[in-house]
Regions:
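N-terminal export/assembly segments and adjacent metallocofactor-ligating motifs
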Residues: 1-173
Length: 173
C-alpha cells in the first residue's frame, strides 16, 4: 500500500522488510521516537506514534529514516516524477541555512534541477540533516530568488555591483 504520509514523506508498506533502521534512527539519532513496530510475526508492521498518520504525528520531517531505508519503503515525496534515481548527478556542498556548516549532497536531474538533498557522511552532521537542509533546497530555482546584491538608499533597495555591496558592508551601511 503506497500512501502519502505527509508533505515530505511517502510510505509503501509492501516494501518494508522490518529491518528497524528507521526506528533506530528516529530514536537514537533524532531522539524523537516516532517510528515503532506493532504486532507480532506475520502481522508485524511499522507504525508512527501509535497509529497516527505521519503528518499528524510528532515527526519533525527530518528525513533521516528515508535516507537509511534500504528498500524504498520510505521515500521523499519531493523526488517523485523528477527522473530515475540512477540518472541523478551528485554535487557535494555545505548547507546554507544556519552556521553549523552541515555537509550535504545535492542531486540534480538531467535538466539541472535540484531534486534531492542527502546528508554527507562527514563534518559536524555526520550524514544527518534537519528539515530545512533536507527539503529547503528548491528556493535556488525560484524565479523570485535574488541574483544581484541590493543596497538600501533613501529607504528603498537598489541593485548594486558586488564591489559596491561589499564596500557598503565594510562601511557598516
Amino acid at each position: 500500500v503506497d500512501t502519502v504520509s505527509s508533505k515530505g514523506l511517502r510510505r509503501n508498506e509492501n516494501r518494508c522488510i522490518l529491518c528497524g533502521r528507521c526506528v533506530k534512527a528516529c530514536a537514537e539519532i533524532q531522539m524523537n521516537r516516532v517510528w515503532d513496530f506493532t504486532g507480532r510475526g506475520s502481522t508485524a508492521h511499522l507504525t508512527s506514534d501509535m497509529y497516527d498518520a505521519i503528518g499528524d504525528s510528532s515527526c519533525v520531517q527530518c528525513g533521516t529514516c528515508v535516507q537509511l531505508c534500504p528498500t524504498g519503503a520510505l521515500s521523499f515525496q519531493t523526488v517523485l516524477g523528477r527522473g530515475p534515481e540512477w540518472e541523478l548527478e551528485k554535487e557535494s556542498s555545505i548547507c546554507i541555512y544556519c552556521g553549523v556548516g552541515c555537509k550535504i549532497d545535492y542531486y540534480k536531474n538531467k535538466e539541472g534541477l535540484l531534486v534531492k538533498a542527502m546528508g554527507h557522511d562527514a563534518g559536524p552532521n555526520r550524514g544527518h540533516l534537519c528539515v530545512k537542509g533536507r527539503f529547503g533546497f528548491d528556493f535556488v530555482q525560484s524565479p523570485k530568488r535574488l541574483t544581484k546584491p541590493l543596497i538600501k538608499k533613501d529607504g528603498a533597495f537598489e541593485e548594486a555591483t558586488w564591489d559596491e555591496a561589499i564596500g557598503a558592508a565594510n562601511a557598516g551601511a
